[in-house]
Every structure is written in structure tokens, then in C-alpha cells.
């Protein structure tokens, strides 16, 4: 079971952060992510995300995939700790309707789409063990930097160390801690608040 430990910070100007990430980290890819969130009767514990993603790797290879994710989310002091489960419905080349077929199944099971999110940006890894840094333009919300560490288990010591590393990297990137956004994107999009 992988546990995501992550934070996101709102940015006014992504250019200086992008420049610092190129000097601090290893560039991985550019991406476009189109997410549809599904739930049964507004029940948050039934939420499922279907993500259609196109990645252009640093070496120029292009990947298309449809991922399905559900998670148990906890937020502590602006840091998300997610027990995330994810699987691929289709990968590489055209979607071949894999995502459409899966969304048809969700519909038959009584789930309905309740929010959509579009995100484009770039990804780097920084340090060892790696922190994934994604610089994203989220449609209708603006620019964000997301920093994420994957842990093997939900251990309090590991969570505390990871939180410290994420906040330290935020400081290295000259991003004030008050720019950390603790609300999930879905909440911001639902409430129409950027």
C-alpha cells in the first residue's frame, strides 16, 4: 500500500519556480490531465476519479493513458496524506474507448460525474528519495506547485519527516508557507473559489 504525502501551493508567477526546478531537479515530462470525478448521491466516500492523461517524456516519447483512482484523504496542517488506489484502464496510443467503457460501468452502478478538472504542466523529481514536483495550470483556479512523496506505509515518523522535507523544499523554492492551499481542488471548483 503506497501512501501519498503531498502539499500544494498557489503561485502568482510560475516562471521563477520553473527556473529553480530546472536547476534543482531532474525534468521528467510535460502533461495534460483531464479528470472527471464520479460519486453516488453526493457521498464523498464513493468518489472515483477517471483521469485521461497525455504525457510527453523528457526524451520526446508520448504516452496516453486512462487511470482510475480512489483514495482515503486526510489533511493535516495543509499536508494531504492519501491512501490512494489506482489502476490503468488503457495505456499508450489512442484510448481505444477503455475510459469510455469504464465510465459507462460507473454510470450503470449509479455513480454520476459531479466535477471536472483540467490541468496542464511540467514534472520534475528533486532529491533522494525523490520528491515529485508538478507545476500546474489548473483551469479556472490558476497556477499551483504540487510536491509529493510516496511512502511505503502510513507511519507517523515517515509522515513527519516527509512533511519536513516538503516544507523545506518549498522554502528552497522561495515559496512562503502561507501560500500552501489545504483545500482540495474539487472543493475549490465546486465552490467556485480560486
Task: Show the residue positions of the predicted features.
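Conserved, surface-exposed functional patches that form binding/active-site neighborhoods
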Residues: 109-156
Amino acid at each position: 500500500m503506497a501512501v501519498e504525502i503531498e502539499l500544494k501551493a498557489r503561485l502568482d508567477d510560475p516562471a521563477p519556480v520553473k527556473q529553480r526546478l530546472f536547476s534543482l531537479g531532474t525534468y521528467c515530462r510535460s502533461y495534460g490531465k483531464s479528470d472527471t470525478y464520479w460519486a453516488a448521491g453526493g457521498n464523498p466516500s464513493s468518489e472515483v476519479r477517471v483521469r485521461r492523461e497525455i504525457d510527453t517524456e523528457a526524451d520526446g516519447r508520448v504516452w496516453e493513458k486512462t487511470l482510475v483512482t480512489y483514495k482515503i484523504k486526510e489533511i493535516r496542517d495543509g499536508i494531504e496524506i492519501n491512501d490512494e488506489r489506482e489502476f490503468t484502464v488503457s495505456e499508450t496510443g489512442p484510448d481505444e474507448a477503455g475510459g469510455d467503457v469504464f465510465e459507462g460501468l460507473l454510470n450503470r452502478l449509479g455513480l454520476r460525474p459531479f466535477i471536472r478538472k483540467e490541468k496542464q504542466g511540467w514534472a520534475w523529481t528533486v532529491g533522494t528519495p525523490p520528491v515529485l514536483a508538478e507545476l500546474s495550470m489548473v483551469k479556472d483556479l490558476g497556477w499551483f506547485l504540487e510536491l509529493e512523496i510516496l511512502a511505503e506505509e502510513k507511519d507517523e515518523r515517515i509522515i513527519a519527516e516527509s512533511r519536513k522535507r516538503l516544507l523545506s523544499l518549498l522554502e528552497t523554492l522561495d515559496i512562503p508557507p502561507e501560500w500552501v492551499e489545504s483545500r482540495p481542488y474539487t472543493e475549490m471548483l465546486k465552490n467556485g473559489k480560486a
